[in-house]
Structure formats: C-alpha cells, structure tokens
Curated annotation (Swiss-Prot):
A family per Pfam: Ribosomal_L7Ae
Listed GO MF terms: RNA binding
Protein's name in the database: RNA-binding protein TTE2299
Keyword line: RNA-binding
Domain of life: Bacteria
Residue stretches spanning the membrane: none
Family of this protein: Belongs to the eukaryotic ribosomal protein eL8 family.
InterPro entries per UniProt: Ribosomal_eL30-like_sf, Ribosomal_eL8/eL30/eS12/Gad45, RNA_bf_YbxF-like
C-alpha cells in the first residue's frame, strides 16, 4: 500500500527525501549549515525532479520557521500526491 503524503510541510532529512520521492513538493528548504552528507541525496532528487531549493542561513532558523524548538537540516512544502 502506498504511503499517504503528509499535508503542508515535512521537517527533517528523512521525511523530506521521502516526500520528494513520493509526493508533489512545491519547494524544499535546506539550511546552509547542514552537513553535506545529510542533504546530498535530497539535492540530487530535487535536481532530478525540478523541485526548487530555498536555502536558509541556519538550521536553527529553519527549525524556527517550521515551528520547532530545535534546528532542522531540511524541510519541504508538500502539495499533494504524485
């Protein structure tokens, strides 16, 4: 059974990659200070699928944008099923 795409925004590298691969994603946010090995697959998948990447200065700032109290390397705006 296919996984349902979450509404609105997902946070974190694993959830972002899953959304990019399985859902319609409007854009992906990546913190500039995130470690490259954490975001590499996400960047590649976005490039392959033509998804816009928005770079945010820090993980802390991205976490705050997503309404969480810790830093986040990535997040994605999900707009529906692929």
């Amino acid at each position: 059974m296919a996984e349902q795409c979450p509404p609105k925004r997902v946070v974190g590298a694993k959830q972002t990659l899953k959304a990019v691969l399985n859902c319609k994603v409007a854009q992906v946010y990546i913190a500039k200070d995130a470690e490259e090995h954490v975001v590499k697959k996400i960047k590649e998948a976005c490039e392959e699928k033509g998804i816009k990447i928005v770079y945010i200065d820090t993980m802390k700032e991205l976490g705050r944008m997503c309404g969480i109290d810790v830093g986040a390397a990535t997040a994605a705006d999900v707009i529906g099923e692929r």
